[in-house]
């Protein structure tokens, strides 16, 4: 794969995939933990063979392909896919669709529902009823696409700006994770993390 990439200029589509001969190649980020002062991680983009299709098994093949490509250059590192397509139960539990925090009334809210229900648009929001939907329903709610430009986020009577990018999402995720002590400890066993569905484009 690396030799092909040296000789062929890749023209990536919106899904960050390209074709080299008969091989479909994708590019996805790998987030590498770097504990210490300042930014605690770095991001690298990795090229890997892509398996097209909507079936779950195809996504799982893509995850394995991405991890194999990464470990080929970073031997000995433990990589965890954080999504419902993870082969490890920890990765599934850490997905934003599943990782949840419990309020004082005993109700669980997932990271995804908190994030989507906090969006303020030019023409509406925040839609707090999304807290009580499934994560999938919250993400696909039509109002998130028909309420104009995203302006900010609101949570617990506090406003959050759009910049720095991903700040609010990261803040929600980290604050939810620390409330799940077992998961927060288990994640420390890994060196790098992926989300096969995440496309930075």
Can you describe what each PLM-predicted range is?
Residues 171-193:
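A short mid-domain helix/strand-loop element embedded in enzyme catalytic domains
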Residues 198-200:
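Active-site nucleophilic cysteine motif
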